[in-house]
Amino acid sequence: MTVKTTVSTKDIDEAFLRLKDIVKETPLQLDHYLSQKYDCKVYLKREDLQWVRSFKLRGAYNAISVLSDEAKSKGITCASAGNHAQGVAYTAKKLNLNAVIFMPVTTPLQKVNQVKFFGNSNVEVVLTGDTFDHCLAEALTYTSEHQMNFIDPFNNVHTISGQGTLAKEMLEQSKTDNVNFDYLFAAIGGGGLISGISTYFKTYSPTTKIIGVEPSGASSMYESVVVNNQVVTLPNIDKFVDGASVARVGDITFEIAKENVDDYVQVDEGAVCSTILDMYSKQAIVAEPAGALSVSALENYKDHIKGKTVVCVISGGNNDINRMKEIEERSLLYEEMKHYFILNFPQRPGALREFVNDVLGPQDDITKFEYLKKSSQNTGTVIIGIQLKDHDDLIQLKQRVNHFDPSNIYINENKMLYSLLI
């Protein structure tokens, strides 16, 4: 049997009909804060408000619903860092199918619990592997051994067609408001979302520039399309943006992206964290790291989008509240507002007061101080964290620290040491 490897607008239109009573029509909102910040019109497609809080339900339901009754009776499997798993679980419950869902051990607990909630007794969750790619290998082996049906999170034309319904929905909404998009920003993990969206836009909104956004620590599509002109597997990836941390994109999504995507942006994970905090405080939007990628990329494109009309897909809002401390720390590090040092303190009364008076600036704040006094030594080792009001104060701070202790270690520049603090 020949496996279909292309996606058409007809496929997306058919998927749209399958999904119209299943998925929520999520809002397309003009965002006044971002529009003012970037001197353009910025619209947000709020897939974080979908039933499973991400766009993944679209692709999962479409891919499962086209299976034959015989195939459905054998059960389904999937591998996912979280959102695709929730879409599969929701669908399994809706269609009363048995599903075995494989998730990386590193998946945030919030996403694991949501999968169990949406799937209930129809779903078994298996945590395995440190990355999506390791998890995928386990899932494929299990699927083959048990003769079940694997629902690919991105490298499947039915999954891609389902994700593409987001574009059809978006363009219908924009037509109602008489809006034409100059730029569209969307996250790339394995490439299913950007493939579906770009397929529809290239036919029905061909002047819109399609910009794919990846975390800088997992830019597998950029490395494949732009650097190597073939699908490559990244040897190492940063897993922080878990919803978009994929070492190898799909063969199908690679071909579609190569044809349709106009440009790629790699966003530092720290910048994503700053965006998450900004969206929460300014817009009351709870975005997960992958969901914030599209908005983060606007900073890279600020000169291009001035005076234009832009849409960003907020692809997901499944953020674990327990990660907020790390998100804040990564943001402060990226913004050069928080700094850690290892110092040798003289073991005598008044040494700390001397440090405060001689080293700290008038607006600097000590956020961490760890010190263990050793009576057998003249000095003791101190780990100290200092938060600045203005990152431009860093140069003078480091000069004062060096004067206080020339042998100090600046932890921010040592990734291994810094990882012990957050």
From Swiss-Prot:
Give the N6-(pyridoxal phosphate)lysine positions (modified residues): 56
- Describe the reaction catalysed, as an equation: L-threonine = 2-oxobutanoate + NH4(+)
Name the enzyme's class.
lyase
* Cofactor(s) essential for the protein: pyridoxal 5'-phosphate
Q: Does the keyword Transmembrane helix apply?
A: no
Q: Which residues form the ACT-like domain?
A: 339-413
One biological process term from GO is:
threonine metabolic process
Single GO molecular function? L-serine ammonia-lyase activity
InterPro entries recorded: ACT-like_dom_sf, IlvA, Ser/Thr_Dehydratase, Ser/Thr_deHydtase_PyrdxlP-BS, TD_ACT-like, TD_ACT-like_sf, TrpB-like_PALP, TrpB-like_PALP_sf
Q: Which Pfam families match?
A: PALP, Thr_dehydrat_C
The biological pathway it contributes to is: Amino-acid biosynthesis; L-isoleucine biosynthesis; 2-oxobutanoate from L-threonine: step 1/1
What NCBIfam families does its record include?
PRK08639.1, THD1
Q: Which family is it part of?
A: Belongs to the serine/threonine dehydratase family.
Name of this chain's protein? L-threonine dehydratase biosynthetic IlvA
Lineage of the organism: Bacteria, Bacillati, Bacillota, Bacilli, Bacillales
